[in-house]
Regions:
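A non-transmembrane, solvent-exposed segment enriched in polar/low-complexity residues
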Residues: 1-38
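Generic structural signal for well-ordered beta-strand positions
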Residues: 12, 20, 120-121, 221
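N-terminal targeting signals for export/organelle localization
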Residues: 34-106
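N-terminal "domain-start" segment that seeds a small globular fold
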Residues: 89-122, 186, 233-235
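Short, internal strand/loop/helix patches
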Residues: 111, 176-217
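Conserved redox-active cysteine motifs that mediate thiol-disulfide chemistry
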Residues: 126-129, 134-151
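Structural microenvironment flanking redox-active thiols in thiol-disulfide oxidoreductases
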Residues: 144-182, 194-201, 232
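Thiol-/selenol-based redox modules, centered on thioredoxin-like
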Residues: 216-239
């Protein structure tokens, strides 16, 4: 039992460590990670008494909060006696929010401004693909994404494609300093409300960087895009 958790934890740690500077190792660990992830889920939901266990919802919440399919299966298996369990409530809330940000769902419309006060409204860009990257001045992983985003920007110049970075800072000075330091060629907008703002809430942003692609009809086309797969995915739109 404990071995299933240990194996998953070890692979998750190794894979996360490799993401920064060893892409080949990261890629080689991905199928092992997926296998350990699936085994962990199967182990938790098949435990005797899982349906009525006060502890099982905590594990589901901790490990599978981002997985709509697994979350739905786990919730369907929980007994009604767990309805007042705080983690079941969290899982349900999370599940409902995740459903709203799946590909094919309408993208939440927002109006945000950049540091100079120029206003951008998402629905003004209907007819174009829109990439939205959620980022922050303090986010090291986000900075690693910048070269890949710049490649996307260069590859889509002159096409019906626009990009935004939604800054997740709460401090205006930090936001302004970050904008000036990185001088990105696309708009960086913010409501300075970080995770509690309506934009982050409606896009269910719980970790960054988080990247969405919105289609010309204003629907979510893809999310969790990163690095080379993001570049390839977007290049294919214009082939």
């Amino acid at each position: 039992g404990a071995g299933v958790f240990r194996r998953f934890g070890r692979i998750r740690y190794e894979r996360s460590k490799a993401f920064k500077d060893d892409r080949a190792r990261y890629d080689s660990l991905t199928p092992l990670y997926q296998e350990a992830y699936n085994k962990l889920f199967d182990y938790i939901v098949s435990l005797p008494g899982c349906a009525t266990s006060q502890v099982a919802p905590h594990y589901v919440w901790e490990y599978f909060a981002e997985d709509l399919d697994k979350m739905g299966k786990a919730l369907a298996g929980f007994d009604a006696s767990l309805n007042s369990n705080v983690f079941v409530a969290e899982c349900r809330d999370n599940w409902e929010k995740e459903k709203k940000v799946q590909p094919g769902q309408p993208a939440y419309d927002f109006t945000l401004s950049d540091i100079d006060g120029k206003v951008y409204k998402l629905s003004d860009f209907r007819g174009k693909y829109v990439l939205i990257e959620f980022s922050a001045s303090w986010c090291g992983w986000c900075k690693l994404e910048i070269p890949y985003l710049k490649t996307v920007y260069e590859n889509t110049k002159g096409k019906n494609f626009v990009m935004f970075t939604v800054n997740m800072d709460e401090d205006r000075e930090k936001w302004e300093k970050d904008v000036k330091e990185y001088n990105l060629p696309w708009p960086v907008v913010s409501d300075l409300k970080a995770y509690s703002g309506p934009v982050a809430q409606n896009y269910h942003v719980k970790g960054i960087p988080m990247i969405y692609l919105i289609d010309p009809e204003g629907k979510i086309m893809a999310r969790d895009l990163r690095r080379e797969p993001m570049i390839e995915y977007i290049n294919k739109l214009f082939k």
